[in-house]
Amino acid sequence: MINLRKTHPLMKIINHSFIDLPAPSNISAWWNFGSLLGICLIIQILTGLFLAMHYTSDTLTAFSSVAHICRDVNYGWLIRNLHANGASMFFMCLFLHVGRGIYYGSYLYKETWNIGVILLLTVMATAFVGYVLPWGQMSFWGATVITNLLSAIPYIGTTLAEWIWGGFAVDKATLTRFFAFHFILPFIIVALAIVHLLFLHETGSNNPTGINPDSDKIPFHPYYTIKDALGLMFLFLILLLLALFSPDSLGDPDNFSPANPLNTPPHIKPEWYFLFAYAILRSIPNKLGGVLALLASILILLIMPFLHTANQRSMMFRPVSQTLFWILTANLITLTWIGGQPVEQPFIIIGQLASMLYFLLILVLMPLAGLFENYMLKPKW
């Protein structure tokens, strides 16, 4: 009998991608996050689809339609809680996935890395427009503050902001188009993820040592399908614990009040996963400077392959770079904390120092550490 898995045009693609794919024998649990991100995306699309069936993108009814979903729709509360907390899980996996890439030098697969950065930006855009949809106080004011940053662009800024708003302020037109964007972007993310995988399979996976693993490969199935299934169980466990026991712990209490353009909340802040970038934005007193720093904080990932100075790919055997990497991690956690604090001392100065250290670590200290480690590894006789 002909093996359909290896001959059928469609099954053949799936087979080469997930079944007979040769994978390095030593990849650790840090390589689980790619598949977890795929699952997160599927969860978000499915729950989002069911939410879209009951949601209305009108300023007068958006807030009450979300309340209606939670109160009157069968399991609507569960669908909404899974969708809202699923976004948090998505970003948690994303940050760990990017961190893994930096630690093990995966950014040297330039095409895969660049598509990954575009994916990160697209997911951030999707999450931002999605946060506006419930039309609560923080949704409205978050949208107002962040879209207003466009007006910092010289000459065309104000026109651009009004073009995005569809008027002279965030209003009905803005909400309608944000809903349209929030619906279409996940499908663009799916397409980008396929391209991401396509480029990854051109080179094969990296591994913890950073050494070419061609001499020791194993089939993806059953070894890594089982390993991914374990990660998936942990993901579901954490997501269900969040969604069922503490669904609002990562949200903002201001979003329990309908949007009111006449009443500004005392402290405007985005969701937790944007706080590090928000802290960098706020650390610069100049509006345009802040916007540029905000963009640079993400786009800096694109130049990482060119900042790699070490002779070894992975940080596994590079203790100085490892130390700097964990300082960077601690620094990002500090920035996340600062982003959620009011604009007053000592938070202002801590935010400015942490922002400066963020760029200093990536642009100067880590490349220097690579050169230093090269020097230390040279034979001295």
From Swiss-Prot:
<keyword id="KW-0496">Mitochondrion</keyword>
<feature type="binding site" description="axial binding residue">
    <location>
        <position position="196"/>
    </location>
    <ligand>
        <name>heme b b566</name>
    </ligand>
</feature>
<dbReference type="InterPro" id="IPR027387">
    <property type="entry name" value="Cytb/b6-like_sf"/>
</dbReference>
<keyword id="KW-0679">Respiratory chain</keyword>
<keyword id="KW-0813">Transport</keyword>
<keyword id="KW-0472">Membrane</keyword>
<feature type="transmembrane region" description="Helical">
    <location>
        <begin position="33"/>
        <end position="53"/>
    </location>
</feature>
<keyword id="KW-0830">Ubiquinone</keyword>
<dbReference type="GO" id="GO:0008121">
    <property type="term" value="F:ubiquinol-cytochrome-c reductase activity"/>
</dbReference>
<comment type="subunit">
    <text>The cytochrome bc1 complex contains 11 subunits: 3 respiratory subunits (MT-CYB, CYC1 and UQCRFS1), 2 core proteins (UQCRC1 and UQCRC2) and 6 low-molecular weight proteins (UQCRH/QCR6, UQCRB/QCR7, UQCRQ/QCR8, UQCR10/QCR9, UQCR11/QCR10 and a cleavage product of UQCRFS1). This cytochrome bc1 complex then forms a dimer.</text>
</comment>
<dbReference type="GO" id="GO:0045275">
    <property type="term" value="C:respiratory chain complex III"/>
</dbReference>
<feature type="transmembrane region" description="Helical">
    <location>
        <begin position="320"/>
        <end position="340"/>
    </location>
</feature>
<comment type="function">
    <text>Component of the ubiquinol-cytochrome c reductase complex (complex III or cytochrome b-c1 complex) that is part of the mitochondrial respiratory chain. The b-c1 complex mediates electron transfer from ubiquinol to cytochrome c. Contributes to the generation of a proton gradient across the mitochondrial membrane that is then used for ATP synthesis.</text>
</comment>
<feature type="binding site" description="axial binding residue">
    <location>
        <position position="83"/>
    </location>
    <ligand>
        <name>heme b b562</name>
    </ligand>
</feature>
<dbReference type="InterPro" id="IPR005798">
    <property type="entry name" value="Cyt_b/b6_C"/>
</dbReference>
<keyword id="KW-0812">Transmembrane</keyword>
<feature type="transmembrane region" description="Helical">
    <location>
        <begin position="226"/>
        <end position="246"/>
    </location>
</feature>
<dbReference type="GO" id="GO:0005743">
    <property type="term" value="C:mitochondrial inner membrane"/>
</dbReference>
<dbReference type="InterPro" id="IPR036150">
    <property type="entry name" value="Cyt_b/b6_C_sf"/>
</dbReference>
<keyword id="KW-0479">Metal-binding</keyword>
<dbReference type="InterPro" id="IPR016174">
    <property type="entry name" value="Di-haem_cyt_TM"/>
</dbReference>
<feature type="transmembrane region" description="Helical">
    <location>
        <begin position="178"/>
        <end position="198"/>
    </location>
</feature>
<feature type="transmembrane region" description="Helical">
    <location>
        <begin position="288"/>
        <end position="308"/>
    </location>
</feature>
<feature type="transmembrane region" description="Helical">
    <location>
        <begin position="77"/>
        <end position="98"/>
    </location>
</feature>
<keyword id="KW-1133">Transmembrane helix</keyword>
<comment type="similarity">
    <text>Belongs to the cytochrome b family.</text>
</comment>
<keyword id="KW-0249">Electron transport</keyword>
<dbReference type="InterPro" id="IPR048260">
    <property type="entry name" value="Cytochrome_b_C_euk/bac"/>
</dbReference>
<keyword id="KW-0408">Iron</keyword>
<dbReference type="InterPro" id="IPR005797">
    <property type="entry name" value="Cyt_b/b6_N"/>
</dbReference>
<dbReference type="InterPro" id="IPR030689">
    <property type="entry name" value="Cytochrome_b"/>
</dbReference>
<keyword id="KW-0999">Mitochondrion inner membrane</keyword>
<dbReference type="Pfam" id="PF00033">
    <property type="entry name" value="Cytochrome_B"/>
</dbReference>
<feature type="binding site" description="axial binding residue">
    <location>
        <position position="97"/>
    </location>
    <ligand>
        <name>heme b b566</name>
    </ligand>
</feature>
<dbReference type="Pfam" id="PF00032">
    <property type="entry name" value="Cytochrom_B_C"/>
</dbReference>
<feature type="transmembrane region" description="Helical">
    <location>
        <begin position="347"/>
        <end position="367"/>
    </location>
</feature>
<keyword id="KW-0349">Heme</keyword>
<dbReference type="GO" id="GO:0006122">
    <property type="term" value="P:mitochondrial electron transport, ubiquinol to cytochrome c"/>
</dbReference>
<dbReference type="GO" id="GO:0046872">
    <property type="term" value="F:metal ion binding"/>
</dbReference>
<dbReference type="InterPro" id="IPR048259">
    <property type="entry name" value="Cytochrome_b_N_euk/bac"/>
</dbReference>
<feature type="binding site">
    <location>
        <position position="201"/>
    </location>
    <ligand>
        <name>a ubiquinone</name>
    </ligand>
</feature>
<feature type="binding site" description="axial binding residue">
    <location>
        <position position="182"/>
    </location>
    <ligand>
        <name>heme b b562</name>
    </ligand>
</feature>
